[in-house]
Curated annotation (Swiss-Prot):
It is an enzyme of class 4 (lyase). Converts acetolactate into acetoin. It holds the Pfam family AAL_decarboxy. It comes from the Bacteria. This is Alpha-acetolactate decarboxylase.
Length: 236
């Protein structure tokens, strides 16, 4: 019997865009559902990177912290990554060029994919969302986000590719985070150049969408869905 690969997503990106930032799921609980993924932390304090079953926080001051099981997240997506396609990237490419190559391996455009790219990057441009109070729209917070660029850095990109039909639940297309080989640099990927590396594409069969059912703010939030989708386009 074929093993089912399930993407576990806690909360939605749309809810995050609306300013619902309170962490309500622990890292310990989250990691039961997958070993690769992305997200953010309580009060959107930086970027969450899940690699090889461990969780890291890329903070706005450019530091990286390995997270303990008790730390809480308001939004995250993780998957037990199983590479269906693996290929070597042996020539210099921009992020858009590599993404086009990755998509050429997709069997259709309506399934989620897990992405893992390990390699050498002449340029890596990332951002970290700064800590903010709940209620402030994410797009407003992102206008003051710190951005950093490192040159000639080795490391790993992890993330999820989302079909267009799920835009709002997540961000359509690529949502990628990076962490360096020495765990000193990382964040939400804005753009990059890769010289060489290994690219893994994982098939995802199911989406397990979980909600913060004990969070009263989430339960009664009045969300403008069309406005939230526009905010995702701007912020992500």
């Amino acid at each position: 019997m074929t093993e089912i690969t399930q993407l576990f997503q806690y909360n939605t990106l749309g809810a995050l865009m609306a300013g619902l930032y309170e962490g309500t799921m622990t890292i310990g609980e989250l990691l039961k559902h997958g070993d690769l993924g992305i997200g953010t932390l309580d009060s959107v304090d930086g970027e969450l990177i899940v690699l090889d079953g461990k969780a890291y926080q890329a903070k706005g001051d450019k530091t990286i912290v390995e997270l303990t099981d008790d730390i809480k997240v308001p939004y995250a997506a993780v998957v037990p990554h199983q590479a269906e396609v693996v290929f070597k990237q042996k020539f210099t490419a921009s992020d858009k060029e590599l993404e086009d190559r990755i998509e050429s391996y997709f069997d259709g455009q309506n399934l989620f994919r897990s992405i893992k790219i390990t390699g050498e990057f002449p340029k890596m441009h990332v951002r970290m969302i700064p800590r903010a109070k709940s209620g402030t729209r994410f797009v407003e917070v992102s206008q003051n986000q710190p951005e950093y660029t490192e040159e000639n850095v080795k490391g790993t990109i992890v993330g999820i590719w989302t079909p267009e039909m799920f835009h709002g639940v997540s961000v359509a297309g690529y949502h990628l985070h990076f962490i360096s080989e020495d765990f000193t640099f990382g964040g939400h990927v804005l753009d990059f150049i890769i010289d060489n590396g290994t690219v893994e594409i994982g098939a995802i069969d199911q989406l397990n969408q979980s909600f913060p059912v004990q969070d009263r703010k989430f339960l009664f939030a009045d969300l403008d869905i069309e406005a939230l989708k526009k905010d995702i386009d701007v912020a992500e």
